[in-house]
Amino acid sequence: MPNQEKMEKAIYQFLEALGENPDREGLKDTPKRVAKMYIEMFSGLNQDPKEQFTAVFSENHEEVVIVKDIPFYSMCEHHLVPFYGKAHIAYLPNDGRVTGLSKLARAFEVASKRPQLQERLTAQVAQALEDALAPKGIFVMIEAEHMCMTMRGIKKPGSKTITTVARGLYKDDRYERQEILSLIQKG
C-alpha cells in the first residue's frame, strides 16, 4: 500500500530542492494534495486487471464483441507525466463465453492506473482478457497523446502514439484483423 506520509515528505523535499518555500501560502498543502493525487493515479498498482472479469456468462454468441473509444489516462513511467487517449478492445468469444461490457473498461482502468508504458498497457489488457475468457481472438488498440512528447523534449503537441496487440484469430488471419480495424475506425 502507498505510504502517504512518506510521499508528502518527498514532495516537500522536492519543492525545497526546486528552490521553493513549501511553507508559503500557495504551497503549504501541496505535498498532501500531490500525494493524494498520486495515490489515486496509481490505484491500480495493488490490483490485477483480470480480477475485474467477475461476470462471465455462457451465451449463444459467437461473433465479435467490441467496446471502443474507452477514454483513459495513465502515467508515463519514464517521466511521471500523463498520457491519455482512448482504447478499443475486441474479442471473439470461444464457446459463447462472454463478459459484462463494463468489465472490459474496468480491466483497462486497473491496468492504466500505475506507472506505465503504452506498449505494456496494451499487452496487459490483452493478457487479462485471454486469462479470463480464453477467446478465439483478441485485439486491443490504444491511441494516446503523451505529455512527455508535448511538454518537454521534442515538444510535438497533438502527436498520437498507436499500439496494438492481436492474439489468436486476429493475429493469424489478416482478413479478420482488417475487419476489426474497419469496425473500430467506423464513426
UniProtKB/Swiss-Prot annotation:
Residues annotated as binding Zn(2+): 76, 79, 148
SUPFAM superfamilies: Tetrahydrobiopterin biosynthesis enzymes-like
Example GO BP: tetrahydrofolate biosynthetic process
Pathway the protein contributes to: Cofactor biosynthesis; 7,8-dihydroneopterin triphosphate biosynthesis; 7,8-dihydroneopterin triphosphate from GTP: step 1/1
Reaction equation(s) it catalyzes: GTP + H2O = 7,8-dihydroneopterin 3'-triphosphate + formate + H(+)
Gene3D superfamilies for the chain: 1.10.286.10, 3.30.1130.10
Record bears the keyword Lyase: no
GO molecular function, one term: GTP binding
Keyword field: GTP-binding, Hydrolase, Metal-binding, Nucleotide-binding, One-carbon metabolism, Zinc
Gene Ontology CC annotation, any one: cytoplasm
Superkingdom in the source lineage: Bacteria
Entry EC number(s): 3.5.4.16
HAMAP family associated with the record: FolE (MF_00223)
Homology family: Belongs to the GTP cyclohydrolase I family.
Subunit structure, interactors included: Toroid-shaped homodecamer, composed of two pentamers of five dimers.
Name the UniProt record assigns to this protein: GTP cyclohydrolase 1
